From Swiss-Prot:
It comes from Indian cassava mosaic virus (ICMV). The lineage of its organism: Viruses, Monodnaviria, Shotokuvirae, Cressdnaviricota, Repensiviricetes. This is Putative uncharacterized protein AC5.
Length: 187
């Protein structure tokens, strides 16, 4: 290991971070997303030390969908939601070297307790009981961009319809599940 006085500091400035979440409902959409986010490696250049924008793309996968994807490493999908997940599939995380770089992270969607049909993520769901305790964040997973502060997320787009009870308020720590998302729009 090199001595501390021999280390070279590399300054990286993240000026802005925005995160978008996608919940895919069919295998054909999963393959389309992977084609969009798999980008070529960016060559090493000194001017790339300053990062203008990082767009984090969280791809949430229904547990039963993973078994239908050939060649998908399902190991990162075994972790439940809202817990630290150090084995997430973050592609090209070492190449955060240009504007609008997309970091994809595959997460296991663990919302089956809310659905009437466990094998159909698009089934109609029951309202969340008014007495359900909400302790901490209820969003499906941690985002790359807002690891330091959950209030820093600037965008949240989901593609699943969730019916909530009146006691769930749309404040920063649980707004992901508090909105009616049938139109796939940001809160």
């Amino acid at each position: 290991m090199p001595l501390p006085e021999n280390l070279i500091a590399i300054t990286m400035h993240v000026l802005h971070g925005s995160c978008t979440g996608l919940i895919i409902k069919h295998i054909k959409y999963f393959t389309k997303i992977l084609r969009l986010i798999n980008r070529p490696t960016i060559p090493y250049k000194e001017e790339h030390y300053a990062i203008r924008v990082i767009l984090g793309l969280n791809v949430f996968i229904h547990p039963y969908l993973a078994q239908d994807v050939n060649g998908l490493n399902a190991k990162p999908l075994t972790h439940p939601m809202c817990k630290p997940n150090s084995t997430s599939d973050i592609r090209d995380a070492h190449d955060l070297t240009y504007m609008d770089h997309i970091v994809s992270r595959l997460e296991r969607l663990d919302l089956t307790w809310a659905f009437t049909a466990l094998r159909n993520i698009w089934a109609s769901i029951h309202p969340i009981p008014p007495g359900l305790p909400i302790d901490g964040s209820v969003c499906p997973g941690l985002s790359f961009c807002d690891a330091d502060s959950r209030d820093s997320r600037t965008a949240a787009v989901w593609a699943v319809e969730v019916q909530t009870a009146t006691n769930l308020r749309a404040w920063s720590r649980n707004y992901d599940i508090c909105w009616s998302l049938r139109h796939n729009s940001s809160p």
